A protein has these predicted regions:
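ATP-dependent NMP and nucleoside kinases share a basic, alpha-helical "lid"
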Residues: 94-145
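Short beta-strand-centered segment that lines the nucleotide-binding/catalytic pocket of NTP-utilizing
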Residues: 30-44
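Conserved nucleotide-sensing/catalytic segment adjacent to the nucleotide-binding pocket
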Residues: 48-85
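Hydrophobic positions on the alpha1 helix immediately C-terminal to the Walker A/P-loop
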Residues: 19
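Phosphate-binding/switch loop-helix module in NTP-utilizing enzymes
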Residues: 76-105
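Conserved small/polar residues in nucleotide/adenosyl-binding loops
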Residues: 184-191
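P-loop (Walker A) phosphate-binding loop of NTP-binding proteins
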Residues: 11
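Conserved lysine of the Walker
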Residues: 16
Length: 195
């Protein structure tokens, strides 16, 4: 079985997960989702107080070599052991997810299109964008509700790393996408259905 790999990139809070979930619903049992966030490097040797200060929006924060290897293995029909990232600990957990190949593989992450090795493995490259104000509001809501973070920490991280890295590394990858989806002006579920 030759899988189709669809990459979904875009800034933090742009609507990537919403778009991914629409595609997941559309494809049903034929799809599996891999999150680039799960490939953040282990931070075992760094105290928690220092881990919260790590720049997780820089390409070097991710173990992209492992993701590339895993995508190749899935395309070859092999099962992978995907790492699991724990947002509350700012570190990878000891758990792994057993992921079996499916006809459609969705890969999601802010820096997904920044690495040419990943881009070369993607059959369709999607960039999801939204207005900066919408993105920060969505990020605050998500990080407080789903990740148990405090508002001051979210704002500090946004101003020191998320925003500058977005303009330096994330936004330029829009030009590498086959399709750009705007959550400000376009209903994502319509785009997902047409994809």
């Amino acid at each position: 079985m030759e899988s189709i790999i669809i990459g979904i990139a875009g800034g933090s809070g742009s609507g990537k997960s919403t778009f991914t979930n629409r595609l997941k619903k559309h494809f049903g049992d034929d799809v599996v989702v891999i999150y680039h966030d799960n490939y953040y490097r282990r931070q075992d040797g760094i105290p928690f107080e220092e881990r919260v200060k790590v720049n997780y929006d820089h390409p070097d924060s991710l173990e992209t070599d492992l993701l590339v290897e895993h995508l190749k293995e899935l395309r070859e029909g092999k099962t992978i052991q995907c790492p699991v990232y724990d947002y509350s600990q700012h570190n990878r957990s000891d758990k792994v997810l057993k992921i079996e190949p499916r006809p459609v593989i969705l890969v999601e992450g802010i820096l997904l299109l920044a690495d040419p090795r990943i881009r070369d493995l993607l059959d369709i490259k999607v960039y999801v964008e939204a207005d900066a104000d919408e993105r920060i509001l969505r990020r605050i809501s998500r990080d407080v509700e789903e990740r148990g973070r405090d508002l001051n920490g979210i704002i500090d991280q946004y101003l020191t790393t998320v925003k500058p890295m977005h303009y330096l590394y994330v936004e330029p990858t829009r030009a590498k996408a086959d399709i750009a989806v705007s959550y400000t002006h376009l209903r994502a579920h319509e785009t997902a259905a047409n994809l």
